[in-house]
Structure formats: structure tokens, C-alpha cells
Amino acid sequence: MADYLFRGNLAKLDPDVYELTQLEQERQYRKLILIASESTAPMAVREALASAFQNLYAEGYPDEDTRWMEDDEILDYQARLGEYRRNSDPRYYKGVEYADTVEALARRRAAQTFAANGISADQIFVNVQALSGAPANNAVYQALLNLGDTVMGLNLL
């Protein structure tokens, strides 16, 4: 590997790993996988996950005011960037302005998706930040189960 910065694509830099990724993609395409944590992600999701945003660590939350903005207001980059310059970013690490925009947009869209029965998107608190499996499972248990309910699990040992 002559280019230590790895500026080429995977097929060029490591054809063996590239071939394995293609084989795994084909395997997932041809089979119905009934393990929730291994469900097939759509191509658009895979593209987003492989974008430059994967290089960022955005600890904290975007500006709270974006919770009540419509999509077009959130996507007004010039206005948002001007606000960051004046007021600073509430996150611990700086330089995540576009990540803030993506997260605010995802947060708003999720709230709009679940707005129903007289509850508006502005009344719904949404957190779209990823969790590890254990806290995510506990959140689901707390949301859906009552004290004393039975949970079935697999013994994977």
C-alpha cells in the first residue's frame, strides 16, 4: 500500500476485503434474516452511515431551539451557521455544525412521524442518538412492559 493516507476506494486498496463485503452483501440480499440486530439496511442508510459524518464525535445535543423549527428553517444553513458564530455550539466538541443540522432534521422528522391524535410534533421529545444494545433494550422494556410481565429470551451460551 503505497498511499499511507488510504485515498483510494476499498476495491483498489484492499481487493480481498472488498470481495468479502460484496459476498456478504449478496448473502444478505438473498436470505431472510430474522435477527433484528442484523436486519438489512437500505442502500440510502448505508450511504449515510459511510459518509463523512462517521468521522465526527458530537457529544451533547444540537441547539434546543431547532426542536420547534420546520425542516426549511433547520436546513437554512446560512442562518444556522451565523447563529453558531454568534452564540457558539452547545456541544462539547466544536466543528459539528452540519452534524447538528442532520440530527436536528432527523429529530424533527421523527417527531412529525409520531405526531397523531391531537399531539403535535412540537409536543414530542425525540432523541435520535444511537445507544448500545443493552440500554436500548432496557428503554424498550420500560416503555412497553408492566411490573411482573414475562419476557422471553434465548440462552445463547
Where are these regions (language model features)?
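Structural motif
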Residues: L32-I33, R46-E47, I124-N127, D149-M152
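Conserved N-terminal alpha-helix of the aminotransferase class I/II PLP-enzyme fold
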Residues: A58-P135
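Short alpha-helical segments and helix-capping/turn motifs at coil-helix boundaries
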Residues: L32-L34, A134-Q142
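Predominant activation on well-ordered alpha-helical scaffold segments within soluble catalytic domains
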Residues: Y18, R46-A50, R107-A111, N138, ...
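Conserved PLP-anchoring active-site segment centered on the Schiff-base-forming lysine
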Residues: L145-L157
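N-terminal "arm"/small-domain region of PLP-dependent enzymes with the aminotransferase-like
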Residues: D3-R86
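Glycine-rich helix-loop-beta junction characteristic of Rossmann-like nucleotide cofactor-binding loops
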Residues: G118, Q142-L145
